[in-house]
From Swiss-Prot:
Family per record: Belongs to the fetuin family.
Protein name listed in UniProt: Alpha-2-HS-glycoprotein
Species in which this protein is naturally found: Homo sapiens
InterPro entries: Cystatin_dom, Cystatin_Fetuin_A, Cystatin_sf, Kininogen_Fetuin_HRG, Prot_inh_fetuin_CS
Highest taxon of source: Eukaryota
Amino acid sequence: MKSLVLLLCLAQLWGCHSAPHGPGLIYRQPNCDDPETEEAALVAIDYINQNLPWGYKHTLNQIDEVKVWPQQPSGELFEIEIDTLETTCHVLDPTPVARCSVRQLKEHAVEGDCDFQLLKLDGKFSVVYAKCDSSPDSAEDVRKVCQDCPLLAPLNDTRVVHAAKAALAAFNAQNNGSNFQLEEISRAQLVPLPPSTYVEFTVSGTDCVAKEATEAAKCNLLAEKQYGFCKATLSEKLGGAEVAVTCMVFQTQPVSSQPQPEGANEAVPTPVVDPDAPPSPPLGAPGLPPAGSPPDSHVLLAAPPGHQLHRAHYDLRHTFMGVVSLGSPSGEVSHPRKTRTVVQPSVGAAAGPVVPPCPGRIRHFKV
């Protein structure tokens, strides 16, 4: 009887040993705070900020989950979920995101949620899939932190548009250089007491002289793009409105001749903005380049005609819609969600509670 049991055990062991292990059927789950995992997440953050045509740069807040799948014939595919936070740096601002301040809760913070797939080959990451969305913190949560702090206002609110135009006119009147045109209204808040409108917006330089320009329609954008970022407050007073505005003008950006994916010219609208209409976010930005490619100068996309949305921020989902990147090193990406086998990192026996590998640490605060 003992011999029969031993024979059955040996047969089972041999069956396990000889069973085929198909490529890509087993994934590993490293710790969300491992250096390699964080490196992948930071590449994803760079990808967001290099390709976001509107709004503000985002920074990494937390890594929620990571799975690593072997790829054939070589490399690994990192499937990662991350949380981001909006910073105070506009996407046109050349300041590295590591030096940008995170927008605080009392300022009505904005959180992003992203799913990425990154291929790692020869020690380098490249993005092959990106899907994101973002949303402002709830009014209730803002009120818990600051009862009287203003909330985000719709970007196409008539008071917001009026404040941006008045601030731009005041800036051009004080400017001895180029005349600037309104490019994008980025953020706004309506302050009840004292009654005022706070607005942040971007401008673009033209070939007209500021103090000589009388008709904006006759001014053309500079060949070497020059953008600026402005903050302004329009205060309502008994004697009339009072405008305070400060603008930071960035260095000129040379026109890039980088080749575009086939069909991209048909899909991307011409960068023309009507200064008399409040800008709106694009429906999407097709043909995004892979991460790691040279950071091209930003091109602000004109909103589709008649597309006016009643929103207070630019949602990441309009740019990162879950389309496989055209820059994927191979035409195929495995679909790992169909498999079930998982290999956990080895953990030695130790006293005390076991810390789960994910989610990772919160770098700033939870929204």
